[in-house]
Amino acid sequence: MSFLHPWRCGAQSAVALLALAGVCAAADPAALPAFRPSEPENQVAFEKLYNLDYDTAIQGFEKVLARHPNDAFALNHLLSAILVRELYRTGAMNTGEYANDSFVGQVHRPPDPAQKERIKQLVQQALKLEDAELSHNANNVDMLYARGVTRAQFALYTGLIERAWFSALRNAVGARHDHERVLELSPQYQDAKLVVGTHNYVMGSLPMWVKVAVALVGLSGDREKGIKYLVDAGRANGETSVDADIVLLVFLRREHRYAEALEITHALSPRFSRNYLVALEEGNLLRASGKNREAEEQYRRVWQNGRDGKYGNLHYEMAALGLGDLLRSEKNYASAAAAYDLVADVSAPDPELLQKANLAAGEMYDQMQKRDLAMKKYEAVVSTNSSNGQAEKARQRMKEAYRE
């Protein structure tokens, strides 16, 4: 989770959760836990990663790996950064997609073939190193932990990028077994509770008939145990502490435990003020808990921070969509349309977000019986991308005015 390093969790696709992770901009490097290998550049790279500055983070991890070519932790850190950058680029990190009964998010843009090959190459390199060390000492807890991290990340890759679910499950189970063994050998190795806790929660949340089926192959889960393990990992101030908090945040939202989830966002936001995903999730949680006015204020705050340049070129326009959806739910159609229209004010909005905003704005104008404005919005949807689901809906609206 880094978020991933929720990414690092790898339990099927739950790990993709929200990549709210990459947290940090104004974070004090001294406040971060010690990452292995221990050297200043590693700390700086993690600060950039948590800051969602993936390119700079990757450059830093490349330098660390060049100085420590046989360090499994250095390999995994670089792998994490490249993987989460690709997940962010493909649009697989929308937290809302993990807040319902499905753990399977969507990849909205095709992955980069070169990045896919780089990820697989790093996985193979790390596993070769880890397996070699474990062949000499099967109880080497650091190598067991490192291999579990590699397997978890590969599970995330195969699940969310390759969409190969059986391979993802196999690697996720392997990661869990490695980290359970770590905890058997060294109960105080709290970092291992991230993967084990995530896997327990995911398995414990499956429908009963699926639980029975997976139990036949020796798999089980316990939602409360999973949450407890994530709390333990978050409080340990280890490598996975922030990651554990972010995964926990998503799971608490699924459990409708909004007050507890908000406590996490309140703790993370001041530390990691450039991570707009954390700030945006706070708005989502406020709305889910029925605090609409506070949610509206938060969405507007995120939007204004983005306009003021606090998030760089990250896609903070998601806040305008969230604001529009909230106002729409209150049947405040004029204000909702105005919020959706804000997305187009961003210099380079995400094309899919822009399509969603234009489609929603068109529907609001139809509700207000402003058909000419609605038609312009639907035409804009089709002109952005004429071959996806949003365009199909827009063409339907062009034939018949939308009504709620």
What function would you assign to each model-found segment?
Residues 43, 77, 84, 146, ...:
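"A position-specific structural signal for the A-helix of alpha-solenoid helical repeats
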